[in-house]
C-alpha cells in the first residue's frame, strides 16, 4: 500500500509530464500578456486549445492535478466564513501629505534623520482598492490574506486564486532566483470601465449597485463563494514585498518592483525614480493632472525611500513608516443646486444644518446632502435655498458646501429659515452664551435619544456589538428604549416578535448588551455624552475621582484641579451631575449592575515603581508605541497622564518632533525624558512593553 503513490506516479509518461509543465508555463505567460500587458501574442482560439489540452491530460492523469494548475483557479466550495491570518510583518498604513510644502517637510525629515542629502525616492500611483498579501512558498501561491487592521487579516486564498492576473506559480526567467518564502503585497482593484459594466449588468438584473470601484473590489474579494469572486473583473497590482527568506532581497525599492515584474507579477504602473524632492513634486503634479483619465481609481501618489536598508533604519511611528508617505489628491469638487436646508439634532441637542442637494456624482459617489456646520457658516457663505454651490468631498469622505455661485441666481432663491423650534420635538431652541450653535433643550427629544443611544453603544463607548443605527433607531421608534438605562431592561419577548429578529440574533444582542455592563469606568463616562467630555476627558475624570459617587459630589473647584480642565468643561460636568434627571439615570444604571467605579483603584494605589503617582505628559511621536498604547501603559504603572504641562508635572516624555509642550517644560524646568527612559521606567514598573506594542 505504501508504494501505491509511487506506482501511480510512474504511470505518467515523462513526455506527458513535460508537456503538462510546458502548457502551464505557456498559459501563465499568455495570461500575463493578456491581463497585465494588454498585448496578447496568441488568439483566443489558440489559448482555449492549450487550456483544453491541459484539462484533458489532467483528466487522463489525475495525479498531475496540483493547486497551482491554471485549471484549478475556481473549484473550492463556498466557505462558512474566513479564517484569520496573523501578518508576521505588519502591513502598515501610510501617513498623508496634502501640499508641495508638506512633501518638502516630509523629505526634510528624511534627510535630517538619515544624515544624508542624496536620498532617492520612488513615486507610484496609490491605487484605490483592497490591500492584500500573497504568500509564495517554493514558487507556489499558498495563501492570500486581506490587510485587515495591519496585524490580523482574513484568509481569502481561494478567492485570490480566481484573479487571473495573479500567478498561481512563479516561473522565473533564467538567472533569476525566487526565494523559498516570498510575500508579495499589493492592491486588488477594479478598473473604472469594468466597474461601470458590472453596475450596468447588476442594474439590469435588479441587484443593488456598488457605490464605487473600491467597494466593488472589496465586496467581490470577500465573497464566501469563490465562484462569485471569479465572475467579477478583479485586478491586482503589487507595490512591495513582506516576508523574504532564503536569499538576499533587492537593495532598492525600484529593484524590488523590477524583480516582481520578471516573475510576471503585475506591479503598480508607471513608477518613477526621483533623485530630488523637486522631481517628486513634479511627479505628484503629473499624476494629479491625469487623475481623471486613468483606467483605475487613484486617490494619491505613494512616495517611498528607494534604499531599502535606509527605509528600515528610518523606522516606524505608530503604524506609519517614516520612509514612505502618500500625497493625497485634493478632494473632488462639483457644482450642484441646494434644494433645501434641513436641521439634524444630535445627542447634546445641537442643531446642524444640512444642505439637500440636487444629486451629483463626486469621486464615484452620489452626493445628495452636505454639511453646513452651523448658522454662522450659512451667513458666511451667503447661502440661499436654490443657490448653485460648490460641493467638496473633504478627504473624499464627508461632503461639504464650500462656496456659493451668486452670479447664477435667477431671483427664485429664498433665505434659509433658522429654526426657533426643534424640528423633531417642537421645543424652543436656545443659543448658549459664547457659542454659535443652536440647541434643542428637551432631554426627551426623540432625535436626541436616538443619537444618544448610538453614541452610548459605539465602539469607543460601551461597544455593544450588533446595536447599530438601524436597530437602535427602531427600538426608540417603537418605544422599546425611552431612556439610556432602558437598554438593560429590554423586553426581549417583544423583540422576538419583530420582523427580522430571530432567536439567535436576539440572543447575541442580549449577550452583547449584558457584557457592556463591565466596561471600564472611563468608557461609561464617555458613553453618557456629557458636553465637552470626550474620551480623554472621560479618562481624566475616571483617574481623578475613581467612582461615580465621588464624581457626582465634585465641586467646580475640584473639577478645575484636573490638569487640562478649563471653566467650560468643569461647568458642563458639574451641571450634568446636578441635574436631577441625570442623577436618577445614574441610580438606574447602578441598580441594573453597570460598573461605575475603577475596580483597579486599590491595585493602582499599591503600584511600586518610578511612575507611581507621577503626573506625566507625552509630546512628539513615539517609535515603539502608539500614543494611546503609551497612555494606557502609563496609567497601569500608576501615573496620571495629562494634556498640558504645569508646575505640577513630574515628567515630560518627548518623542520625535516634539511640540510646544517641550518648550513649556523647558520654561518651567520640568524634567524632559526620552522614549528610552519611558520604556525603561515602564519595565521597572512591571509593565510588559513588548507585548503591549504587538497588541
Curated annotation (Swiss-Prot):
Which Pfam families does the UniProt record give? BRCT, DNA_ligase_aden, DNA_ligase_OB, DNA_ligase_ZBD, HHH_2, HHH_5, Nlig-Ia
- Tell me which residues make up the BRCT domain: 606-695
Coiled coil segments of this chain:
none
Question: What class does this enzyme belong to in the EC scheme?
Answer: ligase
List UniProt keywords, sorted A-Z: DNA damage, DNA repair, DNA replication, Ligase, Magnesium, Manganese, Metal-binding, NAD, Zinc
Active site located where? 126 (n6-amp-lysine intermediate)
Keyword Cytoplasm part of the UniProt annotation: no
Q: Which GO terms describe its biological process?
A: DNA repair; DNA replication
Which positions bind NAD(+)?
Answer: 44-48, 93-94, 124, 147, 187, 304, 328
Task: State which Enzyme Commission number(s) the record gives.
Answer: 6.5.1.2
Q: Which residues cross the membrane?
A: none
> What GO cellular-component annotations does this UniProt entry give?
cytosol
Q: State where Zn(2+) binds.
A: 422, 425, 440, 445
InterPro entries, from UniProt?
BRCT_dom (IPR001357), BRCT_dom_sf (IPR036420), DisA/LigA_HHH (IPR041663), DNA_ligase (IPR001679), DNA_ligase_AS (IPR018239), DNA_ligase_CS (IPR033136), DNAligase_adenylation (IPR013839), DNAligase_N (IPR013840)
- Keyword Plastid in record: no
Return one GO MF term: metal ion binding
| Reactions the enzyme catalyzes | NAD(+) + (deoxyribonucleotide)n-3'-hydroxyl + 5'-phospho-(deoxyribonucleotide)m = (deoxyribonucleotide)n+m + AMP + beta-nicotinamide D-nucleotide
Cofactors required: Mg(2+); Mn(2+)
UniProt function note: DNA ligase that catalyzes the formation of phosphodiester linkages between 5'-phosphoryl and 3'-hydroxyl groups in double-stranded DNA using NAD as a coenzyme and as the energy source for the reaction. It is essential for DNA replication and repair of damaged DNA.
Annotated family: Belongs to the NAD-dependent DNA ligase family. LigA subfamily.
Name of the featured protein = DNA ligase
Amino acid at each position: 500500500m505504501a508504494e501505491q503513490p509511487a506506482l501511480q506516479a510512474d504511470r505518467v509518461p515523462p513526455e506527458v509530464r513535460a508537456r503538462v509543465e510546458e502548457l502551464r508555463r505557456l498559459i501563465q505567460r499568455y495570461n500575463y500578456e493578456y491581463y497585465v500587458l494588454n498585448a496578447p501574442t496568441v488568439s483566443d482560439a489558440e489559448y482555449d486549445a492549450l487550456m483544453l489540452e491541459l484539462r484533458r491530460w489532467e483528466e487522463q492523469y489525475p495525479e498531475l492535478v496540483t493547486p497551482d494548475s491554471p485549471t484549478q483557479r475556481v473549484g473550492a466550495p463556498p466557505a462558512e466564513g474566513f479564517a484569520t491570518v496573523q501578518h508576521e510583518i505588519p502591513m502598515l498604513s501610510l501617513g498623508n501629505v496634502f501640499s508641495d510644502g508638506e512633501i518638502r517637510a516630509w523629505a526634510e525629515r528624511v534627510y535630517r534623520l538619515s544624515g544624508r542629502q542624496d536620498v532617492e525616492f520612488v513615486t507610484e500611483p496609490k491605487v484605490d482598492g483592497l490591500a492584500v498579501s500573497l504568500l509564495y512558498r517554493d514558487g507556489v501561491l499558498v495563501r492570500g490574506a486581506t490587510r485587515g487592521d495591519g496585524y490580523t487579516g482574513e484568509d481569502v486564498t481561494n478567492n485570490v486564486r480566481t484573479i487571473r492576473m495573479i500567478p498561481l506559480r512563479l516561473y522565473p526567467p533564467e538567472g533569476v532566483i525566487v526565494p523559498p518564502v516570498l510575500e508579495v503585497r499589493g492592491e486588488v482593484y477594479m478598473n473604472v470601465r469594468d466597474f461601470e459594466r458590472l453596475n450596468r449588468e447588476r442594474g439590469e438584473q435588479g441587484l443593488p449597485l456598488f457605490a464605487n470601484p473600491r467597494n466593488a473590489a472589496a465586496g467581490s474579494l470577500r465573497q464566501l463563494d469563490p465562484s462569485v469572486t471569479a465572475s467579477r473583473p478583479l485586478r491586482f497590482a503589487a507595490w512591495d514585498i513582506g516576508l523574504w527568506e532564503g536569499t538576499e532581497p533587492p537593495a532598492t525599492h525600484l529593484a524590488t518592483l523590477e524583480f516582481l515584474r520578471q516573475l510576471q507579477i503585475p506591479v503598480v504602473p508607471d513608477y518613477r525614480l526621483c533623485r530630488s524632492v523637486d522631481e517628486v513634486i513634479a511627479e505628484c503634479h503629473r499624476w494629479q493632472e491625469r487623475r481623471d483619465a486613468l483606467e483605475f481609481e487613484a486617490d494619491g501618489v505613494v512616495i517611498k525611500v528607494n534604499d531599502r536598508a535606509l527605509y528600515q533604519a528610518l523606522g516606524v511611528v505608530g503604524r506609519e513608516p517614516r520612509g514612505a508617505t502618500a500625497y493625497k489628491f485634493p478632494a473632488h469638487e462639483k457644482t450642484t443646486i441646494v434644494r433645501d436646508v434641513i436641521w439634524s439634532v444630535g445627542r447634546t441637542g445641537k442643531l446642524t444644518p444640512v444642505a439637500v442637494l440636487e444629486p451629483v456624482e463626486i469621486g464615484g459617489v452620489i452626493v445628495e446632502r452636505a454639511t453646513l456646520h452651523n448658522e454662522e457658516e450659512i451667513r458666511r457663505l451667503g447661502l440661499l435655498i436654490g443657490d448653485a454651490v460648490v460641493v467638496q468631498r473633504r478627504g473624499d469622505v464627508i461632503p461639504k458646501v464650500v462656496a456659493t455661485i451668486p452670479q447664477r441666481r435667477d431671483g427664485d432663491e429664498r433665505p434659509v429659515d433658522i429654526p426657533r423650534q426643534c424640528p423633531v420635538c417642537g421645543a424652543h431652541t436656545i443659543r448658549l452664551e459664547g457659542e454659535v450653535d443652536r440647541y434643542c433643550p428637551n432631554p426627551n427629544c426623540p432625535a436626541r435619544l436616538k443619537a444618544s443611544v448610538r453614541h452610548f453603544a459605539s465602539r469607543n463607548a460601551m461597544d455593544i456589538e450588533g446595536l447599530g443605527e438601524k436597530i437602535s433607531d427602531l427600538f426608540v421608534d417603537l418605544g422599546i428604549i425611552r431612556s439610556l438605562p432602558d437598554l438593560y431592561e429590554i423586553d426581549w419577548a417583544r423583540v422576538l416578535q419583530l420582523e427580522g429578529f430571530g432567536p439567535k440574533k436576539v440572543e447575541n444582542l442580549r449577550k452583547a448588551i449584558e457584557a457592556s455592563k463591565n466596561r471600564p469606568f472611563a468608557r461609561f463616562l464617555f458613553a453618557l455624552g456629557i458636553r465637552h467630555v470626550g474620551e480623554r476627558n472621560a479618562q481624566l475624570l475616571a483617574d481623578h475621582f475613581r467612582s461615580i459617587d465621588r464624581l457626582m459630589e465634585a465641586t467646580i473647584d475640584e473639577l478645575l484641579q484636573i490638569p487640562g480642565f478649563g471653566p467650560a468643561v468643569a461647568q458642563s460636568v458639574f451641571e450634568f451631575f446636578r441635574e436631577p434627571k441625570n442623577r436618577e439615570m445614574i441610580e438606574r444604571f447602578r441598580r441594573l449592575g453597570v460598573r461605575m467605579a475603577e475596580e483597579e483603584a486599590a491595585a493602582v494605589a499599591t503600584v511600586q515603581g518610578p511612575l507611581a503617582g507621577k503626573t506625566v505628559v507625552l509630546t512628539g511621536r513615539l517609535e515603539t508605541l502608539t500614543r494611546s498604547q503609551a497612555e494606557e501603559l502609563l496609567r497601569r504603572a500608576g501615573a496620571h497622564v495629562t494634556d498640558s504641562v504645569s508646575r505640577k508635572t513630574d515628567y515630560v516624555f518627548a518623542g520625535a518632533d516634539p511640540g510646544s509642550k517641550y518648550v513649556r517644560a523647558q520654561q518651567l524646568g520640568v524634567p524632559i525624558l526620552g522614549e528610552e527612559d519611558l520604556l525603561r521606567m515602564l519595565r521597572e514598573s512591571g509593565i510588559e512593553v513588548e507585548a503591549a506594542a504587538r497588541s
